[in-house]
A protein has these predicted regions:
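Conserved catalytic or regulatory cores that recognize and/or transform ribose-phosphate-containing ligands
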Residues: 1-155
Length: 155
């Protein structure tokens, strides 16, 4: 099984790598599941120069900016459609100003991929659309882990 780790990057501390690294290790050790980590994939898809500068190109070099963003969007959505079995998403303040996580969850829902949403915001501050795309919601990663263990213990 392969989990896609969705959540804020653009506005998140360390691009959201801390929680992804923790759940990645847990999934491998406890379920022998692999992950698609967009933080790691981005390092392979874009050059260090592109990663460092693409946001500065919004106004200065809009076509160059669009080319980079299209590369990111195409890659992420293709991985969700063609490679991921399910999605784990941390929904926190870092996703509010972004758009990628919203699109990823919508795409996963459209292609009938289970979406496990870990809320780090009050549920009444969470988009109805996002809740509708979710298979299950959790208020912490420990409850998610218990659920995943129960789902996969007989497999």
């Amino acid at each position: 099984m392969i989990a896609y780790l969705s959540g804020g990057m653009e506005n998140a501390k360390d691009s959201g790598s801390q929680w992804r690294n923790k759940i990645k290790l847990w999934l491998k050790e406890n379920l022998d599941h692999d992950v698609i980590d967009p933080v790691e994939i981005q390092k392979k898809t874009l050059t260090k120069y592109e990663i460092k500068n693409y946001r500065n190109w919004i106004n200065k070099k809009p076509q160059k900016f669009n080319n980079i963003i299209h590369k990111i969007i195409d890659r992420d959505l293709s991985l969700i459609k063609n490679n991921a079995d399910y999605i784990i998403c941390l929904w926190d303040e870092s996703v509010i100003l972004g758009g990628g996580t919203h699109g990823e969850l919508t795409m996963a829902y459209y292609f009938s991929k289970p979406v496990y949403l870990v809320l780090n915001l009050p549920i009444n501050k969470t988009s109805s659309w996002i809740l509708g795309c979710s298979t299950k919601t959790f208020t912490n990663f420990e409850d998610l882990k218990i659920d995943l263990l129960q789902q996969h213990e007989s497999k």
